[in-house]
Every structure is written in structure tokens, then in C-alpha cells.
């Protein structure tokens, strides 16, 4: 019996794989239509469908949603690459010139002001190269972006802070040394995103909360010890 069950399981897996195969690398409209069809099927006939079919369709639906998301990200990257190619090209050259100038100045006089200027120039250069391909590019040089909204300025600041943090913990997709060697983001890489910043912020908040809870717990224990002495 176990062999029969295994054969049925393999056939179901093969059927699901074949269903997914026809949607891989297909247009988003085709994927969306299939998602809607599956959603309607599960909504209308969930009470009468066998449980194994429900599980199978739900897994296919989840896989299709992921495929749609990946397709939309790739399409967004393609559009942004075409739209902002020249802007990023000139900003990269400008940021590189400023970095080399700041480095030369710092080597001539290693004071705090020159050190800070060099660090800022490094952030700017890494910002331009590692800015996420999936996002509308935000110019690092504000004098070239006089019509920027308050939200744009906030996002620019957030990206700069994120890049600065990733320089410190050496987690940039393209490091400064690689940039100076002429390297850029690969076609598959997206770059840094604000999701990274939010994740970092949440981890910091959680760490602070745990620290506060430990502190409160220690104080409560001390008060109890004092009470029973």
C-alpha cells in the first residue's frame, strides 16, 4: 500500500510542477489570471474539495504569488535601469571624483574635519553604486534635485544612514574597495533597501526592550531581597 501512496504522491507533485512550469517566465497577466482562478475555486468549492486537493491548490497559489512578485520586481528593475542609467552614471563619476579629492586632502592633513569629509564622500560613493535597482533613484547630490519633496529628502537621508551602517559592518553588496576596482551591482543583485533599515531598527528596538526588561527584573529581585532581609 505504501508503494501505491507514494506513486499517487509523486503524480500529484508532478502535476503541480507541470502546472507551475507553464507560468514560469510568462507574462504577469497570465499569472494574475491563474491566481484569480485558484482564489475563486478555493472560495467557492473549498467545502467540497478533498483536503489533499485543497493543500495542493493552496501551495500552487502561494508559488504563483511568489512568481508574480519576482516578475514585477524584475520588470521594475528593468524600467529603472533604463530610466536612471545616465543619472547614476554621472553621479557615480562625480562621487568618485569627490572621494579621491577628499582622500588626497585627508592624507595631506589627517585632522578630524578632513576625516569626516572623507567618510561622507565614501558614503556618497557607496550610496550611488548600491542604491536599490527596484526603487526610483534619489539623487545623492541635493543641488541637482531642487524640487525634491519632504518624503524624498527623508528617504535620501534614510538610505545614507543605511549605507553608513553597512559600511561599518562590512555588509554592502558592493564594497568601497570593489567600487574603486570598477565593480558595480551584478544583474541579479538589487542593492540595499529600506527593508534592511527597518529590520535593523526593529532588532535594535527589540534589543533595547530586552535590556530594559532585564533591568526591571533585576530591580524587582533586588527589592524582594531587601524586603526579606
Swiss-Prot record:
Q: Which family is this sequence assigned to? A: Belongs to the EFG1 family.
Q: What is the superkingdom listed in this entry's lineage?
A: Eukaryota
Q: Which UniProt keywords apply?
A: Coiled coil, Nucleus, rRNA processing
Output the Pfam families linked to this UniProt entry.
Answer: Efg1 (PF10153)
Q: Which organism is it from?
A: Candida glabrata (strain ATCC 2001 / BCRC 20586 / JCM 3761 / NBRC 0622 / NRRL Y-65 / CBS 138)
Q: What is the gene called?
A: EFG1
Protein name, UniProt field: rRNA-processing protein EFG1
Query: What GO biological process terms are annotated to this protein in UniProt?
Result: maturation of SSU-rRNA from tricistronic rRNA transcript (SSU-rRNA, 5.8S rRNA, LSU-rRNA); nuclear RNA surveillance; re-entry into mitotic cell cycle after pheromone arrest
Q: Which GO terms describe its cellular component?
A: nucleolus; preribosome, small subunit precursor
**Upper lineage ranks?**
Eukaryota, Fungi, Dikarya, Ascomycota, Saccharomycotina
Amino acid at each position: 500500500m505504501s508503494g501505491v501512496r507514494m506513486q499517487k504522491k509523486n503524480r500529484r507533485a508532478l502535476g503541480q510542477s507541470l502546472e507551475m512550469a507553464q507560468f514560469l517566465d510568462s507574462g504577469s497577466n497570465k499569472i494574475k489570471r491563474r491566481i484569480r482562478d485558484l482564489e475563486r475555486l478555493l472560495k467557492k468549492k473549498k467545502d467540497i474539495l478533498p483536503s489533499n486537493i485543497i493543500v495542493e491548490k493552496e501551495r500552487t497559489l502561494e508559488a504563483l504569488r511568489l512568481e508574480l512578485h519576482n516578475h514585477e520586481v524584475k520588470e521594475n528593475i528593468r524600467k529603472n535601469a533604463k530610466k536612471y542609467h545616465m543619472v547614476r552614471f554621472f553621479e557615480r563619476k562625480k562621487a568618485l571624483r569627490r572621494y579621491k579629492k577628499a582622500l588626497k586632502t585627508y592624507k595631506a592633513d589627517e585632522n578630524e574635519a578632513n576625516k569626516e569629509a572623507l567618510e561622507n564622500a565614501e558614503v556618497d560613493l557607496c550610496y550611488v553604486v548600491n542604491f536599490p535597482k527596484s526603487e526610483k533613484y534619489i539623487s545623492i547630490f541635493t543641488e541637482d534635485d531642487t524640487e525634491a519633496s519632504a518624503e524624498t529628502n527623508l528617504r535620501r537621508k534614510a538610505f545614507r544612514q543605511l549605507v553608513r551602517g553597512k559600511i561599518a559592518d562590512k555588509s554592502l553588496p558592493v564594497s568601497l574597495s570593489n567600487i574603486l576596482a570598477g565593480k558595480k551591482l551584478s544583474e541579479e543583485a538589487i542593492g540595499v533597501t529600506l527593508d534592511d533599515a527597518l529590520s535593523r531598527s526593529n532588532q535594535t528596538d527589540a534589543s533595547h526592550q530586552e535590556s530594559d526588561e532585564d533591568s526591571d527584573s533585576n530591580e524587582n529581585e533586588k527589592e524582594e531581597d531587601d524586603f526579606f532581609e
